[in-house]
């Protein structure tokens, strides 16, 4: 078992959810738990959020949906964002998973299985309003408006769309997408709607509709919510190096003084990016400690020379992620986003759930 521990505070995630619910007022709030709950544990997080009356959980694939259904039972809604395909349609039906249909081909597939089972099948429709990833195009939406038989056999529960730049509150593209979405919804007056992701929740009530779908904000990746994640690693080796000693592969760091160097048992095999080589930091007792040398597969080195001697010992824990080094702060060092930091948390880490 790994010597490193990821601690996930479920109470913090629940409090983040309640904050979002308070902002959304009368709209329902679901939860994006795709990619194993952004690397933190979809099942554990979903069970915690069910305690706060969350009933809509969004996953990426049928496989993720099946795993969640097996763990949570039948009384919640599990939505599959990537939609339905010929190979997994029967699995979606068997496990009561609701696909988000992204194009006319997926609608056709779901209709086919509706006819096969001789019953209505639930679905969401995804309208592309400008992010241009998934979603029915304007031409496809027009076909649906003009020919309602295209939805025959389907229990259309929600129409959704996704915002491209919701984290920029003043970006006019948000309003463009909102207006496109509203224009489409006029043709489906009795269908519930969902637009707001985490950032969209804070754009105002016009974006909330019937259901919000936060992911990042639940996991502390929004400035108004709290980080629930701590990653700690113990010092497993200490050495005293003289001036001009080289550290790590390819000798990319050379000591500029006599130095005390500590080694921690994590590396790029654990999702700790090589881009942190010679520029990342960890914290020991609230003090910043620089990463020196290359990040290797299983190990990193840190320079603890400036710490008090009483704080330098084998087994001393360094905080890799936590209150001093949040996922967003870490991500900014290497030009990525907090989402990537969390979803890259390695499977070798021991997971500990509190709260």
Swiss-Prot record:
Alphabetized UniProt keyword annotations: Isomerase, Pyridoxal phosphate
The organism's place on the tree of life at top rank: Bacteria
Active site annotation, chain numbering: 34 (proton acceptor), 249 (proton acceptor)
Name of the top EC class for this enzyme: isomerase
Alphabetical list of Pfam families matching this protein: Ala_racemase_C (PF00842), Ala_racemase_N (PF01168)
GO MF: alanine racemase activity; pyridoxal phosphate binding
InterPro entries, per the entry: Ala_racemase, Ala_racemase/Decarboxylase_C, Ala_racemase_C, Ala_racemase_N, Ala_racemase_pyridoxalP-BS, PLP-binding_barrel
GO biological process: D-alanine biosynthetic process
Gene field: alr
PANTHER family: ALANINE RACEMASE, ALANINE RACEMASE, CATABOLIC-RELATED
Catalytic activity: L-alanine = D-alanine
SMART domains per the UniProt record, alphabetical: Ala_racemase_C
Residues recorded with modification N6-(pyridoxal phosphate)lysine: 34
Record function comment: Catalyzes the interconversion of L-alanine and D-alanine. May also act on other amino acids.
Residue positions binding substrate: 133, 297
Cofactor: pyridoxal 5'-phosphate
Protein name: Alanine racemase
Pathway listed: Amino-acid biosynthesis; D-alanine biosynthesis; D-alanine from L-alanine: step 1/1
CDD domains: PLPDE_III_AR (cd00430)
Family: Belongs to the alanine racemase family.
EC number: 5.1.1.1
UniProt GO cellular component terms: cytosol
